[in-house]
Structures are given as structure tokens and as C-alpha cells.
Amino acid sequence: MNIIADEIKLKQDVVTYRVCEKLKEFTLDSSAVLYYNFPLYRGELPEDLIQAQLLLASPQYGILYFKCLESNRYLTKEEEIYLDDLDVSIINRLNKRSELRKGRRELKFNVTLLIISEKDEIIDDRKYVSLPCLKKAIEANKDAALTDEEFNILLSCIDGTSRLTTKKERKISLDNESKLKADVLNRIQNKEAAFDLEQKKVALVTIDGPQRIRGLAGSGKTIILTMKAALYHMAHPNEDILYTYYTKSLFGLIKNLIERFYRDFADNREPNWKKIHILHGWGGVELGGVYSTACMENGIEPITYNIARQFSSNPFDYVCKSILGTGKIAPKYDLTLIDEGQDFPDHFYQLCYALSKEKRIVWAYDDFQNIFDINLQDEKNTFGKDQKGDYLVDFSKNNNPLQDIVLHTCYRNPRTALIAAFSLGLGIYNSKVLQRLEDNNHWELLGFKVESGHSDVGDQMVISRPIEHTPNIMNQELGIYTIKVSSFSDYASECKFVTQCITQDIQDEKLRPDDICVICLDNRNINAYYSLLSRMLIRNGISTFNLVDAPNANKHFFYENNVTLSTINKAKGNEAGMVYIIGADTVFINRDNVILRNKLFTAITRTKGWVTITGGEKIKYCLEELNKLEENDFKLVFTQPSKETTKTVESGSKVQQNLLLDVQSKIDILVNSGLSVEDIMQFIQRKK
């Protein structure tokens, strides 16, 4: 039996904790789930909350929910009405799924209320049960066992994940074994979505204090944060929630998920958006942000980007540090949720902390978003110290197991695509390994299995990805060959090939245009690439949504019936069924550059299905590395390098990055003086 609860709060609830401990003594199914203070539903008024004290879901014993009385008494009239409403809410949700019914109305399992008391009696069909007789009462609820699929559907109804999957309308064949891309994506999206145990523990429970959620791209971090926002708003409709994020195009997804989850629990009512503040990190005139809003509400003059970059190579960190230095920040938010935490500087965390009333702050963090930044985030340094010199956040001082959760399963990427992304990102099959993880534990935190080696320098390492860390449906439907690589002599040939592939995807494979995303890794020629590609596609009747040309305040990544053309930065946090990565030869011109490798890693991990990588002659090195990966049965086999050899690469990349920032600053000054970008490029060409 698995327990979903804040154990600290549960232990403080003495009566309920005693019942929970008694249930642990029984031999229930290993897949059974016991929820504490969940599920919860909205009553007639926003202030009315209907909540189960304890609810047990089991494939053998059905559903039992408990009212734990603190003394030898009967239910009050108000409690009877409350429990009747809860009963109706639970049964109505379950009855919506035909898979859980036998006939038109009757469920395949029993839904039973047990009132835990010192008595053993039935009054008005209400069963009062003492702890010594609890096992017998549970046994009486036993019925024909549910199948794994049926129980999965039952849990999705309880958890609120039944609305999780976005259903896209695609033309489908009648052949259930069809391998058309549209049919494969349909079968994957129609598979019942349900939280795994790790996700349940963090999504359905909000602890009183800081909490970090770690996991790879596609492990469900955004889904968990949006569920937290919806449930907290259900329970505390008059309190303010901050949800902040880094990638502007995530706004639409975040708002949509919060609304879907809230409507599911609140009988299709809309959340009060005046209490849920979805704000970009920085913000500006056209886009609300945490920094810009904090300045406005606290009477502080905001610092513009152009001014901030004159004082720091990290302008956003500079403005956050500056506003904190004013000492004027007034706490506003009762719950703060930070998405894409790996992209934010420390002073932004400290600003969010200052804006949080009860320091109830939750952040999602991708340990591997930056290939060359493999050190785990230190929460103590991230949030800093108070005036006494004590760390504001220190996980070592709190024994709550929910304060730092790691999600091991990746739900977005096919297994081999994720392994390929790691292989290319780390340079495992490059002429030399470019980056290393410090120890075996770090590999395991990322959901891998260390088959050989201890991560000591010179060790022969063999790393695999357990098949159970990818949903079975994806393994079954997609197989192992999800990545293709093609080389071309010029841009025109490359764009023509990609146009033909996209046209075939839409016409023959029956994909929607908005199932497809193109990511260009050649920043220097991205405008030329997308201009040519757009013209070629429109000749075939295919429209594009070019994010390079989108206004700065754009909040969307997809536009219906358009193929998305994106930069790597704007693609972060988003996903697509079919991903084309063009201009990828630029990554292999300097094969040891980990910053460029990081871009390729991020691009590959946008896919829910297939990836096609294209580029010039140097793309052959990408193909060579992928062939070696396949020869090793999609395992990472390498000799553990020393810290010094990998640090050399890291330092070189950072030097290059700082030089590029300096060049960018000088270009901006020239543009502001009246020169055009074309004038500057012509000058550079003459100097070659």
C-alpha cells in the first residue's frame, strides 16, 4: 500500500494517523493507494470545500473512504450532509467512465464509507467501525479484482489526471496496428494518463515550506506545478498564488493546464484568475513579470535591460539584486511556484522568497538542462542567508521527505531518443568524452542504471536506461528507430528535403501541421533558413508560425494548423510529435564545444515521437556517434574522464560565451548609433 500524504501533518492529526497505522498492518494489494486529505471538491460556494479525510483505492477492495471520529460519538447532522456530498462527488466522477461500470449505472466495485469510532454498529446505513474490526469491514468491500487498465482509470479519476492529455483531432485509420505517425500519436495520447507514485506524492500534497522538484525534461514538472496551483486555489480561494516561468511561450500551456485541473475538481467552474498570477520572470511593458510587477507594486523604478547589461554580464540577476537592495519588497503571495528553475539566477529565487508570505515556495528544477553545469543546485546558496547569517533554506534541517523529490520517469521522449540526447550531449562517443557526472548516484537520480563502474577516473562505465523509466505504450509504439540523420551540400538542398519530409508527414502520415516543430541550431543563418523553408512549404499549401519574427510579448509556441519554426531558446519547455533539427552541423564544426552540445540535447528532448537531424558535411560526426551508440545496444559505454580534462572544455566554452556577450553588447551600441545589422555584417565580411 502506498501512502500519499505530508507525513508531518498526518502525524499531527493523531486520530487519523492511528487509523493509517492500523491500515499498514493489513496485507493489502501492493498497488493500493491511501490518500490523506484528498480528493477535494468544490461545493456550491467558493468557500465550500468537500474533502476526504482518508481514502483507500484498491483493485481488490474498491474504494473506501473514512471519517475518523475523535471520541465515542455519532455523526452530527452537518457531518452527515458533508459526507453525503462527498459520496456523490466521488461516485459521479467514477460513473463518467464507462470502463468502470457494469451496465449503465452500477460500478464494478464498491464505494463505501467507514466511520471510525469505538462502536461497531450500523445506523441509517452508516457503518461505524472500531479499529479491532477494521480489517473485517475492509474485507467485506472486496469484489472482483479490477484489471490494471481499469485500476489505472480509477486512479486517474481520483487524482484528476483524466483531463491531462490534450486530444488532437487527426485523421486515423481503422487499423489498430497502423504505424502511420498520426495513428501512433493518437494511441499514445489516448492512453490513460495517471500520475506515478513519485508524481502523486508531490503533485497532490503541498507542504508548509520550501520544496524542490527535480527531474529531466518530460518528467512532468510543469504538470505537477499546475496541479498544485489548481488544488491550492480550490482549498484557499482567497489566497494569492504566483506561478512564474522562464520561456515566454509556456504561458498558454500553463494557464490551460491550471484551468483544466481546476474545472475537473470544481464541477467545471472557472478559477478566479485575479488570485492566480501567471507571470514571466522579468516582464515588461507588454508582458507581466515578477520583477516588473514587484517594482510597480512597491513603488520602485524598474531598471531596463539596456541599462542593466552595462553593469553585469547577467542583467536579470543584477536587477533582482538591485530591487532586493531597496529593502522595500512587501510579501504578497501565499504560494509561489517557479517553473524552469534551472534557468533563473540566485537573486531571482531570493526575490520570490521575499515576495512569499509563509515561505511556501516550490520550484521545478532540471538537473540536466545545461550539459556543462552538472553540479546539483545547492539550495542554501541559492536562497542566501538572513540577517543573522543563517541559511534561509536548508534541507538538512528538515526531515520532511517531500521537501526534495526526484522524478525518475520521462513521459515525453522515446527511450532511445533520450539516450541519444545524453550520448551526444555528453560526447560519449566523441573522440573524447566531453562531460562527466560526478558519481553513480547522479546517474541514478536521472533515471539511469549503472551496470559497470564506480565513476572513478579510469573506470570502464556502462550506463543503461531501464525500460520501465519510459511508459510502455511509447516503447511498444515507437520501437528503437526514432532518429534519422541526413547530410546536404547547401541550404537549398537541406530545406528542400525538410519540406518534402514535412509534406509527407502531413499528406501521407496524416500528422497535423501543429504536430511538427522545426528547430534551427545555426543562429548565424537562421533567418535565411526559415525564409527559404517558409516559401517552400507555402508552395505546398503548408503555413508556418515563425517564432523568430514573433513579437517580444508572444505567449504561444503553436498556432493551429501551422508548422512551428523556433529557436532553441524558445523551444525550451515545449514539445512536439515530430521534430526537425536543421543546421545541426554547426554543433560539430567545433565538436568539443559543450554549449553547442547542450543545444542539441535540448532540441532532441523536445520530441514526443520522432527526430530528423539535418545539416552540412560535418553532420557526419553526429551520425558516427549515433551509430556507435546503436552498436552498443543503446548503452553509454566509456572510460570515466578526469575532472581536469572535462573542466578544460567547460572553461573554454565559458570564455567563448563571455566574448560573444561582449560582441553582442558592441553590436547593440552600433545599432543604437544608427548603423544597420547589414552594415555591420558587410564590415565583418570585408575584415575576413
Name each model feature, range by range.
Residues 1-174:
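Accessory nucleic-acid engagement/destabilization modules that flank
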Residues 19, 23, 199-202, 229, ...:
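Generic hydrophobic alpha-helical segments
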Residues 42-47, 120-126, 285-293, 415-416, ...:
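Short, solvent-exposed polar/charged micro-motifs at secondary-structure junctions
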Residues 46, 58-95, 106-108, 122-132, ...:
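Conserved P-loop NTPase-based nucleic-acid remodeling module centered on helicase motor cores
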Residues 131-217, 226-236:
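Pre-Walker A segment
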Residues 141-154, 300-327, 575-590, 644-650:
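Extended, charge-rich low-complexity interaction segments
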Residues 179-214, 278-281, 285-286, 290-382, ...:
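Conserved helicase NTPase motor core
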Residues 192, 212-242, 246-273, 281-285, ...:
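Conserved helicase motor core of SF1/SF2 NTP-dependent helicases
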